């Protein structure tokens, strides 16, 4: 559970960092860029700890996919960006891909000990 919380923190800080980059680029000074650097750095730190117990493919797909989903939603709400039918279709495809990756990942079993050979 702890590693899933770390992954959630990685996703939240990635979203915050990316949105602050946009915020800074529309003229709000250096504070946005500083916030971006801090948040993106924290995001990678949280992600690096999360992948200790979560499969890398799953963690990265969730981190990037959920990040893209929420960044797109917040970009529409906060920065008046357009949300076309194609973008919606892309986001739905992204969500379907995340679900497939997550559901198709199995926990590794315990390693099987190699049988010892009897010498004749």
Swiss-Prot record:
The chain crosses the membrane at residues 1-21, 31-51, 54-74, 81-101. One of its GO terms (cellular component) is plasma membrane. It comes from the Bacteria. It is found in: Cell inner membrane. One of its GO terms (molecular function) is spermidine transmembrane transporter activity. It is a multi-pass membrane protein. InterPro entries: Small_drug/metabolite_transptr, Small_multidrug_res, Spermidine_export_MdtJ. Belongs to the drug/metabolite transporter (DMT) superfamily. Small multidrug resistance (SMR) (TC 2.A.7.1) family. MdtJ subfamily. Forms a complex with MdtI. Catalyzes the excretion of spermidine. This is Spermidine export protein MdtJ. It comes from Salmonella typhimurium (strain LT2 / SGSC1412 / ATCC 700720). The gene is mdtJ.
